[in-house]
Amino acid sequence: MSDLESAYRLEYFEEEGFHRRECVSCGAHFWTRDGDRETCGEPPCEDYQFIDNPGFDASYSLTEMRSAMVSYFERAGHDSIDPYPVAANRWRDDVLLTQASIYDFQPHVTSGASPPPANPLVVSQPCIRMQDIDNVGKTGRHTMAFEMLGHHAFNADEGTDYAYDGEVYWKDTAVEHCEGLLADVGVSLDEVTFIEDPWVGGGNAGAAFEVIYRGLELATLVFMSLERDPDGEYEMKDGHTYAEMDRRVVDTGYGVERWTWMSQGTPTVYEAVYPDTIDFLKEQAGIEHTDEEAELVHRASKHAGNLDIDEVADIEDARAGIAAELGVDAERLTELVAPLEDIYAIADHSRVLAYMFGDGIVPSNVGTGYLARMVLRRTKRLVDDIGADVPLDELVDMQADRLGYENRDTIRSIVRSEVEKYGETLERGGRRVEQLAEEYADRGEPVPTDELIELYDSHGIQPGMVADIAADVGATVDAPDDFYSLVAARHDDGDSGAAGGDGGGDDRLADLPETETLYYDDAYGSEFEAVVLDVFEREGEDGDGAFDVVLDQTMFYPEGGGQPADTGVLTGDDHTVDVIDVQERDGVVLHRTTDNPGKGEFVRGQIDTERRRRLMAHHTATHIVVYAARQVLGEHVRQAGAQKGVDSSRIDVTHYERVDRETVKEIERVANEIVRANTSVQCEWPDRHEAEAEYGFDLYQGGIPAGEQIRLVHVDDDVQACGGTHVARTGEIGSIKILNAERVQDGVERLTFAAGAAAVEHVQGQEDDLRAAAEVLDVTPAEVPETAERFFTEWKDRGKTIDDLKEQLAEARASGGGAGEEVDVAGTTAVVQRVDGDMDELQATANALVDGGQVAVVGSGADGAQFVVGVPDGVPVNAGEVVGELAAMVGGGGGGPPDFAQGGGPDAERLDDALSRAADVLGDAASAE
C-alpha cells in the first residue's frame, strides 16, 4: 500500500532549498527553508510568536487585507468572482452552510459536470463553521464566521469528457503563489513551515499542506486528486483506499481574519476584526482592568492556542497549565479571561447571525433555521452573563451594517421576535429542568450530556442554566467542553439523497438514449407519435403486473419539482394502454402502463389535456404566489417546499412570524394583479454561471438542477430555475384564491391555494356552503355571520345557565334533596347516591357533599356505569381504591388520587348492585387504612 510521501516532494521545494523535517514535539512532517528547525511551528508545539510582533510590513484592516490578497491573485492571472451566500443549501442539497470556498463549486464543477465561472479564479468567501463554536473566544484564533480566500484551478486529463480539460496549474505553482503572497506582505519566508496533512472528504482525497507562520496557520493548500476505490493503492486516514482520478483540483483556503490578525499583532484575532464591537461590549459590561491585570491577560493570550477543545482533553486543566506557566492562580486567571472570552464570542456570533439573516435564513426547528436559532440563543445567554444592557438586535445590526446588508430592518425584526420566543420557551422549560434535576439528585448521578442536549433542543435551555437550577436541588451538571459542537452536529447535515424507484439500477436502462422531451417545445401539445425502445416489467402497487415503457420521444411530463406526472394513453395498431404515472431516471422517461404495448412498436400518445392545463396553471401560480409573498412579507421569504395539484396546490415559505388573515389577503391581491396584467411567461436556457451572476441563488426556489445550462422561467419580475410546464401568459390562469394559511413548523408557513378553474370551483363550493347555512338559519347569506355570532353567544349563555342549574341541583342533593343512602365510615357520614346525569353532574354532586364534610359515592347509568368518589380531609379512605373496586363490579376500571377519583364500566345493569355494596367497600377501605 502506497503513502503520499512522494506527492509532497515538489520541484519547487528542491529548487528553493527546502528541507523535510519531523517535528520533535508532535511527529508531523513539514517542509522549511530553515534546516535547523526542530518543530512544526503550530500550537501546542509552539506558542504564538506574532503577538506584539506583527508578521507583516504593514497593519491591515479586514477590508484592506481582503483587497490586498485578491489583488495579488488577480495580478497572478486569476479572475476574481463574487462570493456565494453562507446558506449553501441554496445551490446544494447535501450541506447546509458554506464552510469553505470550494463549497461554491461542489458538486457540479469539481465533478466535471459544469465548467467553473473562471479558471483559475479567486474568491473571498464568507463561511460559517458550526463545529468551531466551542473554541470561539478561547483560543484567540477561532471564529465561527470568517472569510476564506481561495484560489482555485480545475485540471483534467486531455480528451476526457468533462466540462473542462487541460492543465491550468498544480502543486508547485500553488505553493509558489502562496509564498509569493507571503513575500508580498513582508513575511520572512525562512520562518514559514508547510506541514504535510493529507486531506479526505466527500469521497475524494489528496495531499495537503498547512501553512504556518509564527505559530498561526495562515493557509491550507489541498490538492484533490484521488477518489475512493476499494482497489486503490493509497490508504488514507479515514481507513479507505483511494486511486488517482483524471481530474485534479487546487483547493486552497486562506483565513482573511487570521492574516489581518497577523498584520496587527493584537492579543487575539477578535481585537483585529471586531475592535469597535469589543470596546462597546467592554463598556456595557463594565469591564476594567488594572495595569497589572491587563498585562496578565496580555501574556495569557500568547498561550491561548493551547485551549483548542479538539486538541486537549479538558479545558480547565489546560488553563491551569497556562496559569502555572504564568505563575498565577488558575482561578484568578479564569476570573479575568472568562468575561473577555464571552465578549469575543458575542462579537463573532453577532456576525454569524448577520450573515445568516442577511442571506435569508429564518429561525426554525430544522436545518439552517435551527442552527441560526442555536447561535442566537447562545449569544443572548452570553450577553446576559456579562451583564451588558444592550439589545441583541442592536449588536447584530452593527455587524449587518458593516457587512453592507440592505435588509437590516428585517434582520432586527427577526432577532427581536426570536428573543421574545426564547423567553417564553425558557419559562415553559424551567419546570422540566427542575423535574429532571430532582430525578438525578435522587439517583446521586450528574445530569448526563444526552439529557442536556435534549433540553437544549427542546427548550433552548443551556447547560449553565441547567446547572444553576440543578444546584438548588442538589444535582450536578458536567457539560462537555464541546457541548455546542455536539448539538450542531445533530443538525449540521444536508438533505442529501437521490430519488429511488424502479428502473434506477437496470443495466438495460443505462444503455438507452435520453428521451427527447417534447413538452418544453410545446406545453400545449397533447398528441405525439413515438417508437417503443424498451419495456420493463414491474410489479404494480396493487400487486398486479405493470410496465415501464421507454419511448424515443414523449409529450408526457414526468413527476418532478413538485409537479405531478401527466396521465393519458398510448395507442398502437390493435390496442390502447393507459399511462398512469411517468418518472424520469438519468434522462430516460419511464411511462408506467397497465399493459405491454410491445417493444419496437409504433404508438400514438395522448395526454389528459384537462389535467395538463390545470397543472400548468397551478405551477405558474406557484411562482406568482411565492413572488407575491416576498413582496408582502420581505426578501427573506424563500420556498421551503411545494406540491402542485389539479384541484389545489400548496407552497411552504420561510417566515419568522405567523401570517394573519389580512396579510394573506394582501398576498392574494398582489398575486391576482400579476394575473390580470396578463404578463408573458418566458423560458430560456442560459449558462448556469451567467444566470447565477445575474439573478443570484434565489433562482433555486424549487431545487438545484444539474448541467451547464439551466432552464429559467420568467413570470413578471420573478425568475426561477424550473423544469415544469407553464402557461404562456399569466392571464390564462384566470384567478388565484388562497384557501388557507397555516404554520407547518416553526419558521415555515404553508399557503394552500387554487388557480384557474379550480379557484372558481372552490369559490362556488364555499358559496354553496354559505347558502346551505343560510337556509338552516332562515336568513340571507349576508346575514349568516351576524346570525351565527348571535346563536353562538346564546349557546354559550345557555351552557352557563345549565352549568349553574347543575351546581344548584348538586347542592340540593347534597343537602338532603336526593334519595341517597347514608352510612357511617370511621365516624364520618358517607352518602351513596345514584344520579343519572353526565360526569359533570356526578363531579358537582360529589364536590358538594365533600364540601359539606361527607364522603361521596355517586353513580350514574346515563352512559354505561360511572362512579365518582370524594373523600374529605382527615378521613382514612382512599378514593382511588374505592372507585377501582366499584368499577370492577361493572366490568371496568378507574382510579385517581386518595381524595377524589372516578371510573366506570360498560355494564350499567349492575350499577345498583355495585352501589348497594358501596358501604361494605367503604368500611373495608377504612379498616385497611
Swiss-Prot record:
Needed co-factor(s): Zn(2+)
Biological process, per Gene Ontology: alanyl-tRNA aminoacylation
Comment on bound cofactor: Binds 1 zinc ion per subunit.
Localisation: Cytoplasm
Origin species: Halobacterium salinarum (strain ATCC 700922 / JCM 11081 / NRC-1)
Protein purpose: Catalyzes the attachment of alanine to tRNA(Ala) in a two-step reaction: alanine is first activated by ATP to form Ala-AMP and then transferred to the acceptor end of tRNA(Ala). Also edits incorrectly charged Ser-tRNA(Ala) and Gly-tRNA(Ala) via its editing domain.
Binding annotation for Zn(2+): 619, 623, 722, 726
Keywords: Aminoacyl-tRNA synthetase, ATP-binding, Cytoplasm, Ligase, Metal-binding, Nucleotide-binding, Protein biosynthesis, RNA-binding, tRNA-binding, Zinc
Domain of life: Archaea
Main location: cytoplasm
Cellular component, GO annotation: cytoplasm
The protein, known as: Alanine--tRNA ligase
Alphabetized PANTHER family for the sequence: ALANINE--TRNA LIGASE, CYTOPLASMIC, ALANYL-TRNA SYNTHETASE
The protein's enzyme class: ligase
NCBIfam families, per database record: A-tRNA_syn_arch, alaS
Lineage of origin: Archaea, Methanobacteriati, Methanobacteriota, Stenosarchaea group, Halobacteria
Documented EC number(s): 6.1.1.7
GO terms, molecular function: alanine-tRNA ligase activity; aminoacyl-tRNA deacylase activity; ATP binding; tRNA binding; zinc ion binding
Domain free text: Consists of three domains; the N-terminal catalytic domain, the editing domain and the C-terminal C-Ala domain. The editing domain removes incorrectly charged amino acids, while the C-Ala domain, along with tRNA(Ala), serves as a bridge to cooperatively bring together the editing and aminoacylation centers thus stimulating deacylation of misacylated tRNAs.
Coiled-coil ranges (or none): none
Catalytic activity field: tRNA(Ala) + L-alanine + ATP = L-alanyl-tRNA(Ala) + AMP + diphosphate
Family affiliation: Belongs to the class-II aminoacyl-tRNA synthetase family.
